[in-house]
Each structure stands twice: as structure tokens, then as C-alpha cells.
A protein has these predicted regions:
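Conserved S-adenosyl-L-methionine
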Residues: 23-32, 117
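Conserved Rossmann-fold cofactor-binding substructure of NAD(P)-dependent oxidoreductases
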Residues: 57-78
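Conserved Rossmann-fold NAD(P)-dependent oxidoreductase catalytic core, especially the SDR/UDP-sugar
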Residues: 81, 85-141, 145, 149
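Conserved glycine-rich Rossmann-like NAD(P)H-binding loop of the short-chain dehydrogenase/reductase
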Residues: 29-42
């Protein structure tokens, strides 16, 4: 589907883009890949990695700027929306800015994609959008609903929108694994943990890319795709990084949950299970009963929840140590 196509990635200099771009170039050989982002230094650094590859282009711009988006989307077939304000405390202390990027930016992109006749758009979401308690999660919930509704908003146009929902991305820049590793390397003492009960979903960047590929292949429009991924206990992660270190329990930060949720009870009425993922179908227009969207899925039980503490798949301390050892060179780099 993506072979010989033109693909634009918003926020393409982030962790996702650094993995999605080379993997997609290798697997699909697209005609053109455009990285759309607002940080010129990150673009300059990323461009060095793709020097000489005429398929890769860079476009300075902000999702808040609809006119610039419209220009960037010229001759584009597919869009991945990865741009976001995503650090929870940053969003809490800068709420207006978070709304401008995560909500207004989504609206701008939806409008521009429809106007430009883009074929398919996949937006990246987060487990924090399910029953959100922080501003970041709330803005991503609104964003998810905007992209789902975009299929109706498009009217007679052919543009289709879907969403993929992730857990914590293992080893990405600013995530907990490089944070713990930096404390260990500096010998700064105890590893801070907000709550000893805390659990999190974990997904690799490669799994995230594959879920986007699957969404492009499978989508009819309006679906939210949720990858089946393992959970881990944060205390186990700390022990896997620094087995001898003391753990300091510092209390939950504003906007944090003890356990994360990917699919809530209220979504269970419209959720179908597949071997490697779940699919939440939109309630609007009776699309949740659409055979072309359900395909070979099995309806989950009403009241089903997919949370990081009730997950049947877990990463042990040994599993985490093995992953860290195998990915030592790239942890925190992208």
C-alpha cells in the first residue's frame, strides 16, 4: 500500500519518526517521505542520517499553522500524525500551549488533509487518553475523537482517518529507562519511584511502527487500534537497571495514575479482539456493527477493560534486563 507513495510525518524528528522513516524506506520504498516539524536543529541532525537519499525531504512547520500544513501536504498520499505536546508536567503547567498543539493542531491537520485529498491519515495516541486524569490525556482524547469524527466531517471526500493507541515507548528519549540509567551512571543515589504499586504498558518503537503499517492496510476509517503489549512493574524496571540501588518512593506526581488503561469499560461495547491487537470501532453511524470494519474480529465481553495491572502478559526483571542489553546503544538516543 505504501510502495511508491508520498508520506508525510508530522513531528517526524521525534522518537517515532526516527524509527518509522528508515523502517518504511526499507520495507516499502515510498516515492517520498516528508518530515514536518518545527525544530530546525533536530531536522538538521536527522538530515545527516539520510544524506544522499533523495526520497527524504524536510519541511519546517507547526501543526498550529494551517496554511503551512496545506502547503506541506501538496502531492502527499498518506499522513502519520505524531506531533504532540506529550510530557505530562509540561502540559499541566502550560495548558493553553498543550491545547493549541494537541487539539487545534489536530483540527488543522484534519481540515488540510481533506482539502488536499489525502488518502489515509493515522494519528498516534496514548493510553493516557483512556479515562484521562491529566491535561495531556484529555487533549489526546479530544484529538482521538476529532480524528474519528473526521470521517463524517469529510463528507463526500475520500480522506479516511484512524488512530493507533500506544503505551510507554521503551527506551525513547525522556522515558524512564534512560532516566534510571543516567542516575545509575552518575552515582546519584536512590532511584525515585512515585508509587511501589505502579504498572505501565510497554511497547517498542518497532512494534509501534508495525501497528501504523497495519492500520494503513486495514482501516476503513474511524477505528482506534490498540496493540496487545506486555506490562511491567516500575519497581521491576528499576531493579533491572540497577539491582543494587536503593529505591526511593516519592509520591505520585500531578496527573499520574497508578495503573494505565488502554481500553475502558465504556469502550467495551464497541471493541473487537484480534490475535495481536484490539480495535475500538466508532459508535457513530452504527459503524461498530460494520462487517467491513469488524472483519474476523471477536467482540469482547461488555465491561471488558484493558489495563496495565490486569494484563495477562508481563515483562519480568530478566525480560527487561535482556531488552536493555539488546538495545543499549539506542536507549535515549531517539
Amino acid at each position: 500500500m505504501l510502495s511508491n507513495q508520498s508520506i508525510l510525518v508530522t513531528g517526524g524528528t521525534g522518537s517515532f519518526g526516527h524509527t518509522f522513516i528508515p523502517m518504511t524506506l526499507e520495507k516499502y520504498n515510498p516515492r517520498k517521505m516528508i518530515i514536518y516539524s518545527r525544530d530546525e536543529m533536530k531536522q538538521w541532525e536527522m538530515a545527516k542520517k539520510f544524506e544522499g537519499d533523495s526520497r527524504v525531504r524536510f519541511f519546517i512547520g507547526d501543526v498550529r499553522d494551517k496554511e503551512r500544513l496545506n502547503r506541506a501536504l501538496d502531492d502527499v498520499d498518506y499522513v502519520v500524525h505524531a506531533a504532540a505536546t506529550k510530557i505530562v508536567p509540561t502540559a499541566e503547567y502550560n495548558p493553553f500551549e498543550c491545547v493549541k498543539t494537541n487539539i487545534n493542531g489536530a483540527m488543522n491537520l484534519i481540515d488540510a488533509c481533506i482539502d488536499r485529498g489525502i488518502k489515509r491519515v493515522v494519528a498516534l495516541s496514548t493510553d493516557k487518553a483512556s479515562s484521562p486524569i491529566n491535561l495531556y490525556g484529555a487533549t489526546k482524547l479530544v484529538s482521538d475523537k476529532l480524528f474519528v469524527a473526521g470521517n463524517s466531517y469529510a463528507g463526500g471526500h475520500d480522506t479516511r482517518f484512524s488512530v493507533v493507541r500506544y503505551g510507554n515507548v521503551m527506551g525513547s528519549r525522556g522515558s524512564v529507562i534512560p532516566f534510571f540509567m543516567s542516575i545509575k551512571e552518575k552515582g546519584d543515589g536512590a532511584l525515585p519511584i512515585t508509587d511501589e504499586r505502579m504498572t505501565r504498558f510497554m511497547i517498542s518503537l518497532e512494534q509501534g511502527v508495525e501497528l501504523v503499517w497495519h492500520a494503513f492496510e486495514d482501516m476503513e476509517g474511524g477505528e482506534i487500534y490498540v496493540k496487545k503489549i506486555p506490562s511491567m512493574k516500575v519497581v521491576d524496571l528499576a531493579r533491572s537497571v540497577a539491582p543494587e540501588a536503593q529505591l526511593e518512593f516519592v509520591g505520585i506526581r500531578p496527573g499520574e495514575k497508578v495503573h494505565e488503561q488502554m481500553i475502558g469499560e465504556e469502550d467495551s461495547f464497541y471493541t473487537y479482539e484480534y490475535p495481536e491487537h484490539y480495535k475500538i470501532l466508532p459508535a457513530i453511524h452504527n459503524w461498530s456493527n460494520s462487517e467491513e470494519r469488524i472483519k474476523d474480529g471477536q467482540k469482547v465481553a461488555n465491561g471488558f477493560c484493558y489495563t496495565s495491572n490486569n494484563n495477562p502478559h508481563w515483562m519480568s526483571v530478566q525480560d527487561l534486563q535482556n531488552w536493555i542489553k539488546a538495545n543499549q546503544q539506542k536507549i535515549g538516543e531517539i
